[in-house]
Regions:
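N-terminal auxiliary segments of SAM/dcSAM-dependent transferases
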Residues: 1-40, 47
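Class I SAM-dependent methyltransferase Rossmann-like catalytic core
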Residues: 33-80
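Conserved class I S-adenosyl-L-methionine
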Residues: 82-91
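Conserved SAM-binding loop of SAM-dependent methyltransferases across substrates and taxa
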Residues: 92-108
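Conserved SAM/SAH-binding beta-strand->alpha-helix loop
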Residues: 116-121
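A short, conserved alpha-helix within the catalytic core of class I
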Residues: 170-182
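Conserved beta-strand signature within the Rossmann-like core of class I S-adenosyl-L-methionine
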Residues: 185-200
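Substrate-binding/catalytic lobe of Class I Rossmann-like enzymes that use SAM or dcSAM, i.e.
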Residues: 207-289, 297-303
Length: 325
């Protein structure tokens, strides 16, 4: 069944559907290497679990990127009068709040914040928090798959795209280049892209960030099976899957999988039989590619943007690149 579009009466949000969620999930589960699109992590429960992940000691990307933003917020927001701050894959509002705090109220009144995310609940929560803290700024959220539907923001002027959290690393290398190329075509002269990149580093540090001792990342990973059950009407039982995350050094990426701990038959309500998942087989749920200086230049070349500034931390673990058209 096609998901209905939801347009709340306050007109602060827009939700746009592409192909059905069922089609996307089924295609992944029927593939030779079973997989589920990582955007399905972020139902209400998944969004809350990810917020917990960002506060974990092992998960350095969030706190490192925030420290960079805090240190350079004034520079980043210089000349932001009348800006449309478009946050791609916005999640919670903790990072954009750092930038908004650097703006005086008179400039906030001329600005628009446009969070783009697949999670309506995350956007609603962010909107409430931002209105309470920064009442002067207008918030206009778009609930959409930003990979397919980023063109929806083309109407906004004086755009500053904020693509934080190294979320671009969830895309395959070619798709990441294509996406920044698409952004470049949406941008007018003088508009900017703030891109957060998690850099290649020691394998132990990388794997530790995705295998926390408290098991929050494991719960987050397994929650995608609950989402599949809601969408497909299947009978996935998360206790029969083990969280498995590792760094592939050749591909320079973390891979997250769910590994079956026993032979499993998954039932579907709309056709007979079932999907056999033997013990040891995995469902690939996410890639998180890591980056080098080469990729910073590659993105600039593909998008037609120039590197305005590059910010990093003392360990050079995380980089924030300020691109301009």
């Amino acid at each position: 069944m096609q998901r209905e579009l939801t347009i709340p009466s306050n007109d602060a949000f827009r939700e746009i559907a592409t192909k059905t969620e069922e089609e996307e999930m089924l295609a992944g589960l029927m593939a030779a290497q079973k997989h589920l699109p990582c955007k399905f992590f972020y139902d209400e429960a998944g969004s809350k679990l990810f917020e917990q992940i960002t506060r974990l000691e092992e998960y350095y990307p969030s706190r490192t990127e925030k420290s960079i933003l805090k240190r350079h917020a004034g520079e980043l927001m210089r000349g932001a009068e009348g800006a449309s701050l478009v946050e791609i894959g916005s999640g919670d509002c903790s990072k954009i709040s750092i930038l908004l705090q650097a703006l005086p109220e008179v400039i906030l009144k001329t600005s628009i914040y446009v969070p783009v995310d697949v999670s309506l609940s995350a956007i609603e929560e962010s909107r409430c928090k931002l209105e309470e803290r920064f009442g002067a700024i207008e918030v206009c959220g778009i609930v959409a798959d930003f990979i397919q539907q980023i063109h929806l923001v083309s109407q906004y002027e004086n755009k500053i795209f904020c693509f934080f959290g190294s979320t671009i690393g969830n895309l395959d290398r070619r798709d990441a280049v294509r996406f920044v190329e698409k952004l470049g075509k949406l941008m007018n002269t003088g508009e900017r892209l703030l891109l957060g990149l998690d850099m290649v580093k020691d394998k132990a540090v990388l794997e530790g960030a995705y295998n926390d001792e408290k098991g929050v990342t494991a719960r987050f990973n397994k929650n995608i099976l609950n989402v599949a059950n809601k969408i497909l009407g299947t009978n996935f039982e998360s206790e029969y899957f083990r969280h498995h995350a590792f760094f592939d050094e050749e591909k320079q990426r973390i891979e997250m999988h769910l590994m079956a701990t026993r032979d499993i038959t998954i039932k579907f309500p709309f056709f007979e039989g079932g999907l056999e998942i033997p013990k040891g087989q995995t469902i690939h749920t996410e890639n998180s590619h890591k980056f080098t200086s080469h990729h910073i230049d590659e993105f600039a070349s593909a998008s037609g943007l120039s590197v305005r500034a590059v910010y990093t931390d003392s360990n050079r673990w995380f980089t924030l690149v300020d691109y301009i058209k």
